[in-house]
Each structure stands twice: as C-alpha cells, then as structure tokens.
C-alpha cells in the first residue's frame, strides 16, 4: 500500500486506512524477523538532525539496513547549513543524492521548508510541534496490546507538546477518544484540538484524575526537553501531573502505560509505573523500528 502524501510532517496527512495499513505491515515485519528480501536495495536515507537522538536515529538507520538500503547521518556540524547555506538549497541538493530525508529539527517551519524544496519524501523525525513517527509506533503498540483501536479511550497527562499534538491526529484517524490533562497554559495546539473534535471526543482538563478515569491507555512525556531542562517549567507540573500508581488505579483495570522516552523517573512518572506490569514502553520503543520500516515502504521510495 502506498500512501497519498509525499511527506509525513504532522500525522494529519494519514487517514484511517493508511494508518491501519502501515500498522498491519509493521506487525508482519515484526513477526517475520530478519527477512532475506531487501525491498529498499539501492535506496538511501539522509538523516538531517539538528538535535540529539537515540530511538529515532538508530531505528531509522537499522530499519533502512534491514530493508537493504543505506542511511547517512548528517549532524549540524557536518553540513554547510552550519556555515550559512540555505535550507532550500540543501534540500534540493540532497534530493539529487538520496531517496528520502528524515529531519529532526528545532522549529517546525524548518521541516516545512525542507519538504517544500525537496523532490523526495520528507519525514518529520521530531519538531517542536509534532512527532508523527512516534504515534505510528504508539498505535501499533496499542493494537498489539488491545487487539483493536476504535472505541478505546486514551488519557494524556502532562504537557500538551509535540507528541500530544500528533497523538491527537492519530487518535482522530483511528477512532480513539482522548482526554488531555495539562496546566491551562500548556494545552495542545487549539487548531489541532478543533480539527480532531470533528472525528472523536476530545476533553481538555487541568485534572489528571479526571482524564485518567476509565482510560484504556495512559500517556505521558517529559515536562521539558531532556537536553534543555527548564527547572522553573518543571515546577509548574510537579507533583500534580506525575503519573503514579494511584493515578493508574483511576484508569481501566487492564490499562497500559505509555511513554515515548527518554523518561525521568520521579518527575513525570514513578519508577513503579514505568517499570511495572502495566508499562508498554519497551514494546513501544521497539515498535519505532517496525512502524518506520512500514512507513518507508508505504512512501514507495
């Protein structure tokens, strides 16, 4: 199955059929293990990363290798961007060398500029407002754990950040209702919320217990970038928005806990939750590999 969009920048580009197709493909790839088939033989992925990365970098590089392709890691200091070359010129030049670009950037406008200038597909590996690759892995993990997506209810606790924004789009596409508990000043993008409310029930609250009540999945993320910690920002969330055992008891008995990682135990989540029996975070992390392999195939590169 080939998706309609050239690029994946926010998650809104994918409809229900496309997301389910990617998930089904990812599950097949995971079950199939290391295949001798190399559908991306001769293809090259450029990884343009302005920010540090563990899961995104390694999962894309390993995924391309397993599919028979190559991945080139391009940190800021290794590119002429650091010496004043424009983003459009860089994107146009890279398009002549590689088959797909993954960019991990500070400002979302940068990924939009890359996509507008590149003639090859561009994937958002994380920006300040969206993280669509994470949501494909999340939805795959939920499907594995719950056996379905439509009709479930999710709770997001903490910061209405880039992951939350893309999660809203993903939930809207597959029919998962969601309650988002954040401080009033840290809510997700209003336009994203309004769009998703056309398809699903989206509740916004400042009360984590209200959001978690009866939830099938409980999500959280760091309250500030782990590479650029803002202690004053963190204090606006603690201890009220920490996911702990009492909060998980508000959720459904068979609820799962999810976190995109990296995590700060004792900050946004207690160790007994992230390391406990309800935690799906390690499946979630592994599924970055499988879902992104499926995405690369769906882009038709």
UniProtKB/Swiss-Prot annotation:
Keywords: Amino-acid biosynthesis, Arginine biosynthesis, Cytoplasm, Transferase. GO terms for cellular component: cytoplasm. Its EC number is 2.1.3.3. It catalyses: carbamoyl phosphate + L-ornithine = L-citrulline + phosphate + H(+). It is found in: Cytoplasm. It is an enzyme of class 2 (transferase). PROSITE patterns: CARBAMOYLTRANSFERASE. It comes from the Archaea. Coiled coil: none annotated. Carbamoyl phosphate binds at residues 53-56, 80, 104, 131-134, 260-261, 288. GO terms for molecular function: amino acid binding; ornithine carbamoyltransferase activity. Pfam families: OTCace, OTCace_N. GO terms for biological process: arginine biosynthetic process via ornithine; citrulline biosynthetic process; L-arginine biosynthetic process. The keyword Kinase does not apply. InterPro entries: Asp/Orn_carbamoyltranf_P-bd, Asp/Orn_carbamoylTrfase, Asp/Orn_carbamoylTrfase_sf, Asp_carbamoyltransf_Asp/Orn-bd, Orn/put_carbamltrans, OTCase_ArgI. Pathway: Amino-acid biosynthesis; L-arginine biosynthesis; L-arginine from L-ornithine and carbamoyl phosphate: step 1/3. L-ornithine binds at residues 162, 221, 225-226. Reversibly catalyzes the transfer of the carbamoyl group from carbamoyl phosphate (CP) to the N(epsilon) atom of ornithine (ORN) to produce L-citrulline. NCBIfam families: orni_carb_tr, PRK00779.1. Belongs to the aspartate/ornithine carbamoyltransferase superfamily. OTCase family. This is Ornithine carbamoyltransferase. It comes from Cenarchaeum symbiosum (strain A).
């Amino acid at each position: 199955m080939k998706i309609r969009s050239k690029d994946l920048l926010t998650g809104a580009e994918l409809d229900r059929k496309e997301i389910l197709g990617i998930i089904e493909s990812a599950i097949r790839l995971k079950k199939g293990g290391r295949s001798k088939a190399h559908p991306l033989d001769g293809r090259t992925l450029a990884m343009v990363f302005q920010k540090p990365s563990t899961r995104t970098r390694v999962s894309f590089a390993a995924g391309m290798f397993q599919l028979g392709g190559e991945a080139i890691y391009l940190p800021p200091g290794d590119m002429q961007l650091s010496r004043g070359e424009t983003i459009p010129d860089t994107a146009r030049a890279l398009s002549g060398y590689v088959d797909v670009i993954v960019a991990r950037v500070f400002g979302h406008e940068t990924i939009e500029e890359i996509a507008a200038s590149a003639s090859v597909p561009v994937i958002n590996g994380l920006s300040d407002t969206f993280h669509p690759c994470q949501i494909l892995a999340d939805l795959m993990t939920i499907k594995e754990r719950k056996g379905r997506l439509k009709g479930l209810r999710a709770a997001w606790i903490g910061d209405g950040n880039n992951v939350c924004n893309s999660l809203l789009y993903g939930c809207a596409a597959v029919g998962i209702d969601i309650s988002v508990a954040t401080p009033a000043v840290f809510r997700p993008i209003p336009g994203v919320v309004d769009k998703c409310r056309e398809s699903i029930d989206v509740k916004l609250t400042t009360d984590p217990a209200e959001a978690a009540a009866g939830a099938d999945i409980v999500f959280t993320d760091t309250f500030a970038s782990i590479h650029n910690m803002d202690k004053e920002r963190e204090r606006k969330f603690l201890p009220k928005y920490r996911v702990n055992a009492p909060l998980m008891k508000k959720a459904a008995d068979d609820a799962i806990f999810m976190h995109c990682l990296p995590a700060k135990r004792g900050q946004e989540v207690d160790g007994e939750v992230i390391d406990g029996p309800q935690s799906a975070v390690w499946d979630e992390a592994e599924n970055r590999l499988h879902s992104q392999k499926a995405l690369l195939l769906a882009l038709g590169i």
